[in-house]
Amino acid sequence: MVGEGCWPRRDTPLEAAIVVGLTCGLRPGELLALAWDDVDLDVGLLRVRRAVIRVRGKVELGMTKTASSRRELRLPAAAQDALRAHRQRQNEQRQQTGTYWQDHGLVFPTGVGTLLDPSNLRRSLLQATHKAGLGHWHPHELRHSAASLLSAAGVPLEEIADLLGHSSTWVTSSVYRHRTTPTVEAAAAPMDRLFGPPQDT
């Protein structure tokens, strides 16, 4: 189980990226392509519409991996809290950066507002997990861990497939045959139980 001492230092962009990646099961490219227009913190929804891709050695915004990867997710409370704090820090950073800031509306940009290269996310996560004694973690491990945690919490396979935007299994295909833009809500409650504040007993 990922505990308090395993997170990177509080009040850093990496912390928010890890929380969202782990609780929502996003692909690294989907995570880095998120724009604030894709996030509705008032109602707790996140829309996955794009992905960061590499074209001739450069990163740019592109399509998601598959049509089923374009999805709408209910944000667990831990992710909502992390994103609210992250947005406030980003606003402060934008003011400090001044005219050097390039406003593309990205949730997890570079220090000047541009697209973050996935290799930089991978390097930062590797440093954080090594420091926490967790060994070598690739950003995809957040996605895999989300699936494992939800499975252990008893979430049905079909709902996990919806959350992850899978399209390669028969079960996932049968779900998307009937609804092309699902709002995945069932996975949020188990993630809140796993990562939310302790419940009174």
Residue ranges and their predicted role:
Residues 43-48, 138, 149-150, 161-179, ...:
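Short functional hotspots where side chains directly engage DNA or cofactors
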Residues 12, 19, 23-30, 119-120, ...:
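C-terminal catalytic core of tyrosine-transesterase DNA break-rejoin enzymes
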Residues 82-85, 92, 118:
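Helix-coil-helix junctions within alpha-helical repeat/solenoid scaffolds
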Residues 3, 84-88, 122-130:
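Amphipathic, well-packed alpha-helical segments that form the structural scaffold of globular domains
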Residues 8, 43, 52-79, 89-96, ...:
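C-terminal secondary-structure termini that scaffold catalytic or DNA-interacting sites
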Residues 1-34, 41-42, 53, 68-69, ...:
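Basic, Lys/Arg- and aromatic-enriched nucleic-acid-binding interface segment
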Residues 18-20, 31, 48, 75, ...:
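Conserved hydrophobic/aromatic pocket- or pore-lining residues that grip, position, or stack substrates
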